[in-house]
């Protein structure tokens, strides 16, 4: 039964792709990310570079409008300055006390499955211009923390980070047709988080990031 369902899904994708209503692609996206505090117990202490990559799926219900989704694996994060002494869990029975005034750098790994709307122009020369907006649900699959001189050096801190994250995104860019249905893509996107990333109830922060999206659509 499972094999039959998979076969039917593949047939549906093939038919849709043959009708040019479905486009698939791959992307790799440099990221600049930061954690924005929502309490006065912590302060932002700088951004961190990151990277994301994966698959793009676009389904068009009109020549100029479509639904976009995909699957991405990426690393983002940010630096936080704690204004009071904080206990950071590094395992089942281990923890590190970080003193007030210390900065902690978080590197966070996520699986992202975005869903949004894409609006695009007709092709002008070889160029097509587009805008996108939507939501980006994320699942945390890894979290590390570093604080120089305070006992944290890329330690795993899964208990400090919430499993689920959510942001809305908007941005735009350009596609360059290199032949047939194949296009190079470049765009700039901003994600604004609205779910607390930190599991500690007294320290709240959301994840924001700026993305340079680079990809190929087929």
Predicted regions and their residues:
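Outer-membrane beta-barrel channels and translocator barrels
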Residues: 19, 62, 122-126, 177-181
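Residues on the lipid-exposed face of transmembrane beta-strands in outer-membrane beta-barrel proteins
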Residues: 26-30, 51-59, 71-73, 113-119, ...
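Residues that define the transmembrane beta-barrel architecture of outer-membrane proteins
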Residues: 20, 47-51, 107-111, 127, ...
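Predominantly the C-terminal beta-signal and adjacent terminal strand-loop region
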Residues: 76-82, 159, 165-218
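Flexible, solvent-exposed loop segments that connect beta-strands
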Residues: 35-44, 77-109, 141-162, 198-203
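Positively charged n-region of N-terminal signal peptides that target proteins for export
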Residues: 1-4, 19
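Sec-dependent N-terminal signal peptides
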Residues: 4-13
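Short glycine/proline- and aromatic-enriched beta-strand/turn motifs that initiate or cap beta-hairpins
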Residues: 17-56, 217
